[in-house]
Every structure is written in C-alpha cells, then in structure tokens.
Amino acid sequence: MAGRPLRIGDQLVLEEDYDETYIPSEQEILEFAREIGIDPIKEPELMWLAREGIVAPLPGEWKPCQDITGDIYYFNFANGQSMWDHPCDEHYRSLVIQERAKLSTSGAIKKKKKKKEKKDKKDRDPPKSSLALGSSLAPVHVPLGGLAPLRGLVDTPPSALRGSQSVSLGSSVESGRQLGELMLPSQGLKTSAYTKGLLGSIYEDKTALSLLGLGEETNEEDEEESDNQSVHSSSEPLRNLHLDIGALGGDFEYEESLRTSQPEEKKDVSLDSDAAGPPTPCKPSSPGADSSLSSAVGKGRQGSGARPGLPEKEENEKSEPKICRNLVTPKADPTGSEPAKASEKEAPEDTVDAGEEGSRREEAAKEPKKKASALEEGSSDASQELEISEHMKEPQLSDSIASDPKSFHGLDFGFRSRISEHLLDVDVLSPVLGGACRQAQQPLGIEDKDDSQSSQDELQSKQSKGLEERLSPPLPHEERAQSPPRSLATEEEPPQGPEGQPEWKEAEELGEDSAASLSLQLSLQREQAPSPPAACEKGKEQHSQAEELGPGQEEAEDPEEKVAVSPTPPVSPEVRSTEPVAPPEQLSEAALKAMEEAVAQVLEQDQRHLLESKQEKMQQLREKLCQEEEEEILRLHQQKEQSLSSLRERLQKAIEEEEARMREEESQRLSWLRAQVQSSTQADEDQIRAEQEASLQKLREELESQQKAERASLEQKNRQMLEQLKEEIEASEKSEQAALNAAKEKALQQLREQLEGERKEAVATLEKEHSAELERLCSSLEAKHREVVSSLQKKIQEAQQKEEAQLQKCLGQVEHRVHQKSYHVAGYEHELSSLLREKRQEVEGEHERRLDKMKEEHQQVMAKAREQYEAEERKQRAELLGHLTGELERLQRAHERELETVRQEQHKRLEDLRRRHREQERKLQDLELDLETRAKDVKARLALLEVQEETARREKQQLLDVQRQVALKSEEATATHQQLEEAQKEHTHLLQSNQQLREILDELQARKLKLESQVDLLQAQSQQLQKHFSSLEAEAQKKQHLLREVTVEENNASPHFEPDLHIEDLRKSLGTNQTKEVSSSLSQSKEDLYLDSLSSHNVWHLLSAEGVALRSAKEFLVQQTRSMRRRQTALKAAQQHWRHELASAQEVAKDPPGIKALEDMRKNLEKETRHLDEMKSAMRKGHNLLKKKEEKLNQLESSLWEEASDEGTLGGSPTKKAVTFDLSDMDSLSSESSESFSPPHREWWRQQRIDSTPSLTSRKIHGLSHSLRQISSQLSSVLSILDSLNPQSPPPLLASMPAQLPPRDPKSTPTPTYYGSLARFSALSSATPTSTQWAWDSGQGPRLPSSVAQTVDDFLLEKWRKYFPSGIPLLSNSPTPLESRLGYMSASEQLRLLQHSHSQVPEAGSTTFQGIIEANRRWLERVKNDPRLPLFSSTPKPKATLSLLQLGLDEHNRVKVYRF
C-alpha cells in the first residue's frame, strides 16, 4: 500500500498500489473471466472484457479497509456502501451482460440488415456521394454520354467478376480508354510501390498510438460494430466472399452510380492504368494525376484511420468529412472487387513468403503489446480482427461503408481504400466501354476456359512483383519497418489467395503514405528501376509533380494536421487535363480492337523483361528484406519498450500526483470539518466516545468471560449445552446491541439538543449585534444631524451679527437690507429644513436596506449552519451506526472463530493429555514392576544372607568340636589347620571392622562434646550480650529525646525501624532462633540510634544485624522456593485429576451438580495458579533486593575494614572455621550461600575491637545506611507479600513445636516479621525428607517421627480439599498408592521404603555427596585464607526438627563430617 495507512476507530483505511507493469497470466485471466460470468470456450469474443477488468484500477471513491481481524473489504466514502469483492467485478459483470445482449441481438438481425442495406443504400448512396463529390471536385466536368454502354457491363456473369483473373477485366477495359491513353505497367507498379510505403507509415502511426495506451478512448460503437463484423465474418470467409461479390455484381445498377462516380473516375483515371496500361508518351499528365490522387487517398485514409487510436483528433476529422466521402463512395461499384494481377502458380508462393515475413513481424509486434495494459491489448486485438474480417468482407461491406461515414471511421481503413481504388478503376473505364468491352471481358473473367489469358496474367503478376521488389529496397527506413505489419492483414489468410493477390494489395496499400516518402521513392526509382525511356520520362514528370505536391502532403504526415489538409487543389489541374480526351462517342469497335492488340504486345514484352529482372534480384531482395526486417524488429522492440517505460513513468507520476492531491484535499477538508465541529462538539464527542468505549469494553469483557466459560466447559458439555450457550450469547449480544443503539440514540439526541441550543444562542447574539449596530448608526446619524444644525445656527448668528454691524454703519440702508436678509434667512431655513428632511429619509432608507440585508445574511447563515449541522449529524449517525454494526459483526465473527479454534485446541489438548496419561500410566506400571522385582531380589538376598549366617554358625561349632578333639585326632591336624587359619583370618577381619566402627563412634562422641562446649560458650556469650544489651538500653533511654526529634518524612522513609524496643521482648524465648531474632531486632533499633549518633559502635551492630537478616531472608526465600515447587507439583496433579474428572463427567450421564463442582474446582485451580505467579514475581524481586543488600553490606564492611586496617591486626583468636548445612534438601543446596558464621562471637569480637577504633566518616556511612534502609523496606514488603500468598493457617506440625518458634511482637521491626514466616516455612519444608537425606543419614542420626510425614500428608490433603471441595474420590476410594494416581509418593510411604532400603546407598547419592564435600573443602580453604570473612558459624537449628551435618578441617586439612 502506498503511503501511511489512516486509522478510523479500529478500522485501517488502506491505499491501492496500482502496478502499471503488471501482466496477468492466461490462467488468471481465465479465472477472472469465469468470475464475471464469461465462458472462455463458448464466448471467446468477450475475453477482452476479462483482460481489461483484471487490471482495472480501483475507483476513486472506493478504498480498501482492514478490520481488527485482518479481513480486507472495500468501502465507498461517497455513499457509505461496503462490499467484500472488488468493486470493478460487479461493473464488469454488467458489461458482460450488456455485450452478450448486443452480440445476440446483432447476430439475429444481421442477415436481415444486409439485405435491407443493399436495397436502401442503392437509393441513399448516389445522392450523398454526388453531393460530396460535387463539393470537393467542382471544376471537373465529365460528359455523361457513356451511360448506355455501362449498363451492358452488368450482364457479365459473376464468375468473371470474382475470379482470380478478374484483373484482366480492368486491363482490357483500360486498353481503350481516352483515345489510346496508355502507359507502362512498370510506371503503375512504381506508383503502387509508393502507395505501399505510404500505407506502411499509416500503420506504424496507428500501432504506435495503440501501444501508447491511447486506444482506450476509441468510439465504442465503432468497436462493437467492427467486433461483430469480425466475429460473424470469420466462420466461412470464402463462401461468404463469393456470394457477396455475386450478389453485388448482379444487383447493382450502374446508371445511378455512374452519375456520382464520374468525377471520381476522372480523378483516378491513371490509377488503374498503372496496372495494365501500355506506354503512351502523348499523355504525360496522367501520372501526376495518379500521384496526386493517391496522395489524396492516402491523406483521407490517414485521417480516417487515425480515429481508432486517437480520439482527441475527432475535431480535425470532422472538419473534413468530404474527403472521406469522396474516397469511400466509389466502393459501391462491385465490378472492380479484386483487380490484382497474378497467376495461380506465383500467387501462393509469394503469399507464403509474405505470410512468413508477416508472421515474423506480427510476433515481433505482439511482444511489446503483451506488456501493455489490458485495454491496449483489447484495442489492438480488435483492430487485427477488424483487418482480417474486413479483408474477407470488403465487397460485402462496401455499400454500408459508402453510405455511413461513421461506420467507415470505426472500421479499418486499408481495405476500404483498396476497394475504393479498384472500384474507381472500373468506374473510370465505364464511360469509354461499349459492347466490345463486354465481349472482351467475358472470356477473360473465366480462368478455367482461357489458358492464354491466365498465362498473360501470370506474366503480369510476375512483372508487378518484380517491380515491387525492385522498388521496395530503396524505401525509407521507417516505411520498410512499418509496411509488413500493415500488409499482414491481407496475407494472413490462405483462402483469399485465389480471389485477391496479396502483392497487388501491398502495392496499393503502399500508395497511402505521405508525399515525402513518395518523392524519395520517385528519386530512388529513377536510379534503380530498369524501365523503358518513356517510363523514365513519366517517372521524372511524376517526381516533379510529386515535389510540387510535397508541402500539402507533408502536412498530412503530421498526426495533428493530417486531416485538415485538403487533397483537392493538387488533384483538380490534373483532372482538368484529362477532360477533353474521354468522349465516348469518338471510340469505335475497330479502335478498341487495335488498342487491345497493341496492349497485348506491349504486355508480352514487358512481362519477358520483368521475368528476367525478377529472377536475378529475387534472392537478393529476399535476403535484404529478411535482414532489414530483423533490424526493424529490434528497433521496434526498443522503441516500444521505451514508449512503454515512458508511459508507465508518466502514468505513475500522474497517479502519484493525483493521490497527493486527493490526500491534500481530503486532509484540508477533514481539518476544516474538525476545526468547525470541534469547538461545539468536543464535550459530546468525549462523552459518546467514553460511552462507546465503556460499552465496547463491557461487551469485550462479557465476550471474554463467555469464551473462558465455554473453554472451561467445552469438553464436559454436549451439543445441547453448546446450542443453549449460543442462544444465551445471541440474547446477550442482542441486549448489548439494543443498549448500544439506545446509547447511540441518546448521544445523538443530546448532540441535537446542544446544536439547537447553540443555534438559538447564535441567533440571539446576531440579533443583539444587529440591534447594537442599528443603535450605534442611529446615534451617529443624530450626532451628525445635531452638528449640522448647530453649524448652520452658528452661521446664521454670524450673518446676523455682520448685518447688524452694517446696519449701524449704514442707517439709510437698514430697513431695505433687513427685509432682504429676513427673506434670505427664511429661504435658508426652508432649504435647510428640506435638506434635513431628505437627509433623514436617506438615512432611514439606508438603515432599512442595511437591516434587510443583515436579516437576509442572518437567515442565510442560519440556513447554512442548520444544513451543515444536519449534514454533520447525518454523517456522524451513519458513521457511528456503520462502526457499531461493523464492530458487532467483527466481534461475532471473531467470537465464532475463537470458539472454533478453542474447540479444536481443547480437542487436541485432550488427546495429548490422554496420550500422556496413558504413557505415564505405562511408565508407572513399569516402575511398579521394577520395584516389585527389586523387592523380590532384596528378599532373596536376605534369605541368602541368613543361610550364609547359619552355615557360619555351624562351621564355628564344628571348629570348636575340632579343638576339643585335637589331642584325640592329631592325625587330622594338618587337614583342619588350614580351616582354622581361614577362620582366624575371618575373625581378625571382623575384629578390625568392629574396631574401626568403635573409633568412628569415639570420634563422633568427641565431636559431640566439642559441640556441647561450643554451645556452652555461645550461651556464655549470649549472657555477655544480654549484659551489653542492658547497657545499650540505658544509652537508648538517654537518647529518647533525640529520637522524638526525627521528622515525619524520615519515619515514613523507614517505617520498619521503631525505637520502642524493650529487652523483655527479647528474653521470652531461648535457643538459637531466639538469639537470631533478638540480634536482628536489636540491630534494627541500633540502626535507628546510629542515624542520630553516627557512632561506630552502632555501625558494627547494624552491620551484624543486617548480615543475620540477610542470611535469614535467603533461607526464607529458599524455603519459599521449595514450598512453591511443592505447590506447583500439587497443582499439576490437581489439574490432571480435574481433567480426568472432566473427561469422566462427559462420558458418564450429565449431572449439573457434578459440573458445578468441577467449575468450582477449576476456579480454585486458576486462583492457585495466579497465586503461584505472584509468588514467582515476588521471589524474583526478593532475590534482586537481596543481591543489592548484600552488595551494600559488603561496601559498608569494606569501608569499616579500611578504617580499621591501620590500627593493627585483629584482636582475639578466631574460633575454628566450620560450615553447617542442612541436609533436608540437597537439590537447592548449591544455590544457597554456605557462609554462615556465629554472630554472637563476631559481635563480641567486634565490640572489643570497636573500643579502640576512631570515629568513621559520617557522610559515607550515612549514605550506605540510608540505602540499606530502603532495600530492607522493599525486602520486608516483598517478604510480607510472600507470607500473605501462603496459607494463613499453619499446618499441625507448627502446633507440635511451639517452643521452637520465637514470639512475634506487633511492635517489633518488620525484619523479625519475616523471621516468623521463615521459621514456619522452614519447619514445614524440613518436615519433608528426601531420599538423599536418608542416604546421608544411614541409620546413625535420630529418626523423624511418623507425625512429621503425617503432617506433610495432612497439608497436601488440605490443599486437595481446597482444590476439590466436593471430595477426593481417588484418596478416599482407591486402595492403590498415591504415586500411581497423583504422580507423587507420600511422606509416610517414602519413610517406610527408605528405612527398608537405607543400607543400600545409591551411586548417584554417593557421587553427589563426594562432589559436595569436595566443593566445601575448597570453600573452607578459601575462607581460611581470607581474613575479612566472618569467623564464626551460625548457631545450629533445632535438633527436634532438623538433621544437621557439620564439616570441619582437621590438622591435616582434611574434611571431617560431624553429625549432631
């Protein structure tokens, strides 16, 4: 698509990218033809519509649009119509129907029209042609005394007129014309060669124009008529042609046609003499007449032939209709239908050669045509069909063409011009022929009866062909390239060979070109053509006359002016020169016979001469022609490609300009409309948009909820439930649609009311303005009036004063002057009153006119505004309605598609789940069989061991018996000594093994004592810490006033640090967990104290507490990860069980309670899935915060160590480095940090160290502490979220061990808050032993009680009850183990199986254990070499719930395992 698409709502308005260079394939054309209702096999004549329609561009008012589902449709922005198919398809369907109707009606009445036209045109044509010829050839006066002899010419049989030797008629008739006016055939052939070149250039112009795509604007009536004629005339060309010629020859009346054709006969008196006239030196002016006439014919033909390709030159063509009529009218004479001179032997050969050349040229010409548009292809195909059909029907169509100039313009012009030339030949001869002509024509017209005449015609045809080929090489380069395609129409059909000779037609076609080519060929003809002296003289005269005619003819070559030039002025003098030589009364029968004999002799001589020259140069000319044709074909290809490329560029540029202009206009129009409407309808638009969005969102939500419900219940409901659901959806959609319609109507009503109110306000404001304007005008006029009156009064007073002064000076004249002045004053007052009255009337009239004008303008503005608002309202209503209906339809389609896809997906998933379930069941069965076989093997091995033990006891008893009887049986000592040694070896081996076991036990006991001593040391340290805490509490009480001064913003920034911490809260629980929580709580309170005092003492405590909290948070996250994994496993098992129940519920009878229970189960499962997703995101965030906090702690510690590095080495002796890890979950061991040290020792050592350290930089520590506060706050919120996502009520395991959980004080800091959840979840996770743990245990450590495993089962059963409120039939009813059904094994069953086989440690467990020990050894070495790492291990976890191993390094740096 071109340009950026425009979005209207959720619809995308696209632009069509029209490709001018696209050429559809034939298969695409056939498919499109079938789409618009064309049968390509039965209706090939309508295929041009398919070729045109498949590449037709989209109309301007139509635009392609795309909805949100991706479907493309077409929308008419003019009338609001939309459709799925291309708008041009319907248009071309109607065109197909119209064309089919035209073809059917024209085919039905064509035969009737032919007969009627023949009779009607006999009466119509003579007066028309006489008028036309009289107007164009007025100076020509021909006597009409030869009408009686012409009447006898009609009596000749039709075979003489339509035979292949019918040309002899013209030659024999011409032999006695105009008192022996004869000329050489070579001269006539030269002229024919010239006309051939002229016709070629005409065809070139026509082809080029059709290729440029200008043929799209041709006259449709003419094209339809030519198509009909070509279709109906192509079935039986030979038979129709013979019959039409016979009919024309038998029915024509020469008396009527002679009156109209005699001016044309004088005009073309030399045209037929070119073919068969002997040399007559006494008449040199006839060649000039012939050339001028041929040029006139060419010009007329150019003017008429350019119409199919250039409709814009119709005005030039209309300006000269008389020329066309003059050239067309003589075609009505049927006697000269085919005046070609060739024999039966030579004509087929030349026709084949010309046909080959024409086919090659046609192929070359068709290649670029295929690249043009479909309109150009249709026009070119139509023109080719017209040429062929008219060539077969030229005698038949001559009457209609002569009588109807409009049909003449629509048809091809080359054939009509040739017919006119032949008819003119016979018409010219008709006045000079009598009965002798008739007698001479009858034997010459029948080719089977007169062999001698056929031989003469053969010689004549050879001569004509020889001269043609001799004269064709010097043709101009353009004319040689253009003439073969033009003559192809006559050479293409072999059935016309016997009737019309193609070479003569080529020669006559070539006579229709411009005068420039004619003069050039005349000069070349003088140089190359070997002809008698008379012919040369005539050629020179003809060349001179052609040069005189040159300017007029060159004007005709120009495509813009070729019709406007009249050919009659150069023709008239030549025709006048022939007037006194054609009186038919002076000719006698003897003269005619003498002329015939002379003509026969001259013809024989010329034929022999031409045969010899033809045989010599035929091969050379053919080679030259082939070479030139190839060159011209290449040149034509290049020219046509260039023209096509330039046309494409112009069309593309025009399209782009038009698109840009349309976009600009549309944008201007839209911007104008927006600017006009925005001010008045912004609020309403927002309200409507909000309502629409709300309704659409509500509709979408309802649809989504319905889709989810359908997805959930798709597999458990049958067709009846689906139909019911569809009905409910339709009802809801109808209700929503009604609601939308109501909302839309409401919005429109509001908009209408607002517009009415605005209109009233505008009217009121306009009236107020008008009234104000009137008042202002009145006041201004009154003010002016008052000023005028006051000025007049002042003038009067001044005049009175002057008069009084004069009266005082001149007492004698006072009375007289007073009378005069009083009279003048009265006149002045009267004049002033009249002037004021007129002025007042004018002002009032002007006021009234202005008021009327303003009222009219106001009414116009109101009407215009009312119309604009109404149009805008209608437009918005239509847009909203269309948008809503389109949205509803789109949602319905999307809903149906989504339903179908969901149905298919559910079906596929169900199949996959069933297949997986079958595979899992098969695997579980295999595992059960494997376990059974392993159990059997173990039992067998145990039985074997018992048997071996029994045999060992018996052997020992036997050995004792042998020792008692040693003295008695000394002779057997040697035999039994060996047995005794073997027994002793076995005994020693057993003793050694027992000793090793004792040593291991002693080592474990020693380790236990060490650990107890460490515990005592830790208790002592805890007491010391308690004392230190009391001192710190005293200091905290002293600094209470500082804590009260902390601002509200700091409290909000760190809400989890609260200063009111009491030591009694820390003393409520004992043990290691108590120590952790106390230290962490104290670290939080000490951090608050540090923020005020910034003492290094508090910083070390802050660092210690944060380290403990960090490790606790890590452990909590690890426990949460394990819990989440278990919940995920249980969720997967529950989902599998739910799917199984759903499938069983569908297979069994429908029961709504069961379906409702399954729906509740599904909701619970979805809720659990959401909770797990939230837990994942929260844990991810917690991990990130832990990393940040650890980095900050490391930075703080490194800064502290840098401050203390210059104080000397660390005081105190570190205790032994050790690592303690929990074996309850070996899978997540690698992800945990094994750096756990003893915080009390570390804090005590740091306390001892801190006393001697100087104060730190407050700014750096304050920044790090502030970042730690923020991270701790975020981490607390994340851990609280994780705590809230877990089950609220702890499992029974937590109730059985209350002493081990620290109390949670609501006033304590949030850091211990997640310690409680940590303890709860650590206890929960530690209650689930795995096979790896039992492999480590190997029976030495304390066993977990059965209540622990039972607690895990209870917890999982509680989960199952939450997922399945209706009950768990698998757990309550099925006696099979849980592993076979739910995909996991219960803790009790794991304990039972693992205790049974604890002696056999798997290889994988040992390998994992060895790898872990090796990694821990390397880590211990790294810790030993790093002095900055913490020195003490963390306190052990409660022994009642955890089975712990401790790794340590002995004096040889080897790892030793201590279990406790």
UniProtKB/Swiss-Prot annotation:
Extent of Basic residues compositional bias: 109-119
Primary localisation category: cytoplasm
Feature: compositional bias, Basic and acidic residues: 256-270, 310-323, 357-367, 465-481, 537-546, 658-668, 686-719
Example GO biological process: cell division
Source species, domain of life: Eukaryota
Region (Disordered) residue spans: 107-135, 213-412, 440-593, 658-719, 1290-1310
Region called Interaction with ATRIP, residue ranges: 1-194
Subcellular location: Cytoplasm, Cytoskeleton, Microtubule organizing center, Centrosome, Centriole; Nucleus
Residues of the WW domain: 56-89
Modification after translation (UniProt): Phosphorylation at Ser-186 is induced upon DNA-damage caused by treatment with IR irradiation, UV irradiation, hydroxyurea or amphidicolin. Also MDC1-mediated chromatin remodeling is critical for DNA damage-induced phosphorylation.
Role according to the record: Plays a role in microtubule organization and/or maintenance for the formation of primary cilia (PC), a microtubule-based structure that protrudes from the surface of epithelial cells. Plays a critical role in G2/M checkpoint and nuclear divisions. A key player in the DNA damage-activated ATR/ATM signaling cascade since it is required for the proper phosphorylation of H2AX, RPA, CHEK2 and CHEK1. Plays a critical role in chromosome segregation, acting as a mediator required for the maintenance of genomic stability through modulation of MDC1, RPA and CHEK1.
Disease in which the protein is involved: Nephronophthisis 15: An autosomal recessive disorder characterized by the association of nephronophthisis with Leber congenital amaurosis and retinal degeneration, often resulting in blindness during childhood. Additional features include seizures, cerebellar vermis hypoplasia, facial dysmorphism, bronchiectasis and liver failure. Nephronophthisis is a chronic tubulo-interstitial nephritis that progresses to end-stage renal failure.
Protein name: Centrosomal protein of 164 kDa
Organism name: Homo sapiens
Lineage: Eukaryota, Metazoa, Chordata, Craniata, Vertebrata
